[in-house]
């Protein structure tokens, strides 16, 4: 059974509109946005796992590289997953402790490019919207594959630089160049953007992720995370995919 069979049924236009609507509340009502994204991610990973293995994700050990402030921890724990979050930023870890209250899951302070876990030690390794924030995204990808057991899944999802959300809070000014966009943001707001080009935000392209994933020999599927199923073919069109695939999901299964 292809790894995306179940999830493709979920990837409807209504879902895309719902997530796009929630995106508007990222700054003003983060619980609304990140809660919706976390629930959708749990469903996506569950669908991918069930299609690949025929089993439920309940009881799995999942390592989330870049776990953030705890929304994913709560959602995966509620689904019966043994959640481990890796987060290099202590501020995010403190936010996670406050958000999850009962400390859903386990959090480890570490870098995604040097994971402090043994080879083949987790069932699923997930990274959601992190690769564009590290200078060596494919080293992160290699680490994800290293810690994922044979027959498990590594799911790497990242924001494509030339897509409409590539500039993050800098908006569409990133089409004028990343450094210029950061300077424009600084002049407008009086401070550097949180996602500052060249230090905490990097230009990661769809072609780069596909080339890396294909080179591993473990690629099961690649698709646009937020698009309806009928638009997934964009991933196969060079050039066009850089602008229209706003977020690329790479699903890998180490042997």
UniProtKB/Swiss-Prot annotation:
Listed EC numbers: 2.1.1.-
Taxonomy, superkingdom: Bacteria
InterPro entries cross-referenced by the UniProt entry: Methyltransf_11 (IPR013216), SAM-dependent_MTases_sf (IPR029063)
Gene3D superfamilies: Vaccinia Virus protein VP39
Keywords (A to Z) from UniProt: Methyltransferase, Transferase
GO process terms (BP): methylation
GO molecular function: S-adenosylmethionine-dependent methyltransferase activity
Membership in a protein family: Belongs to the methyltransferase superfamily.
PANTHER family xref list: 2-METHOXY-6-POLYPRENYL-1,4-BENZOQUINOL METHYLASE, MITOCHONDRIAL, METHYLTRANSFERASE
Name of this protein: Uncharacterized methyltransferase Mvan_0241
């Amino acid at each position: 059974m292809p790894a995306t069979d179940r999830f493709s049924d979920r990837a409807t236009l209504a879902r895309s509109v719902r997530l796009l609507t929630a995106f508007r509340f990222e700054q003003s009502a983060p619980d609304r946005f990140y809660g919706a994204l976390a629930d959708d991610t749990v469903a996506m990973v569950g669908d991918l796992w069930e299609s690949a293995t025929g089993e439920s994700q309940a009881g799995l050990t999942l390592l989330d590289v870049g776990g953030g402030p705890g929304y994913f921890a709560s959602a995966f724990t509620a689904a019966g997953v043994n959640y481990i979050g890796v987060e290099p930023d202590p501020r995010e870890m403190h936010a996670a402790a406050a958000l999850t209250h009962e400390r859903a899951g386990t959090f480890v302070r570490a870098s995604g490019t040097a994971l402090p876990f043994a080879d083949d030690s987790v069932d699923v390794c997930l990274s959601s919207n992190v690769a564009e924030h590290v200078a060596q995204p494919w080293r992160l990808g290699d680490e994800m594959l290293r810690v994922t057991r044979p027959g498990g899944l590594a799911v790497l999802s990242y924001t494509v630089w030339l897509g409409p959300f590539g500039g993050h809070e800098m908006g569409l000014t990133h089409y004028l160049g990343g450094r210029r966009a950061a300077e424009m943001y600084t002049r407008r707001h009086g401070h550097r953007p949180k996602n500052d080009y060249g230090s905490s935000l990097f230009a990661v392209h769809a072609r780069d992720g596909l080339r890396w994933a294909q080179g591993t020999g473990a690629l099961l599927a690649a698709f646009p995370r937020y698009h309806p199923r009928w638009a997934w073919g964009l991933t196969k069109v060079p050039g066009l995919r850089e602008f229209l695939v706003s977020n690329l999901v790479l699903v890998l299964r180490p042997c």
